[in-house]
Amino acid sequence: MLSGPHPSPTFRPNPCPWPCLHSLWMEISPTQLCFLSPGPSPQSPSCCFQGMNSGSELGKLWRKLFKGIPRLSVSHFDFYCGTCVLLGRPQIPQGSSLGNDIDQYPVVFRNASDQGSWMQLEMLLRKLSDLVWTSDALSDKILEDGLVP
């Protein structure tokens, strides 16, 4: 069961010219994630890390991913806004009647944790671009560049 009231995901304005995907982390705290979708991109995605703890494991992972993606690839993408659900504990929905609330979002991160390794983060984007990223798909490029310890 959730320890507090179930927060309602909402879009938040972002002054960054690269809108970011905002998400709610059940039982933890709101967080901000950036995702790529097709389109022209006029500048660096680094502004999307505003407000994110630069020392966090998630922040470090995003920086490694962007270093591992060829610059040409990044220049052909734009960031877009959306709402997703991060499930820190997959057993939370069982018996909680939150299944329908969770299923309405195009992106759901299961077994997400604020502790431990974010290197296994799997991103499933089914809205707008149908772009699918997995840690496996990027691992070769990241390892080639020596970005993963």
From Swiss-Prot:
Gene Ontology molecular functions: beta-galactoside (CMP) alpha-2,3-sialyltransferase activity
One term under GO cellular component: membrane
Domain of life, per lineage: Eukaryota
GO biological process: ganglioside biosynthetic process via lactosylceramide; protein glycosylation; sialylation
InterPro entries: Beta-gal_alpha2-3_sialyltrans, GT29-like_sf
Protein name: Uncharacterized protein C20orf173
Lineage: Eukaryota, Metazoa, Chordata, Craniata, Vertebrata
Gene name linked to the record: C20orf173
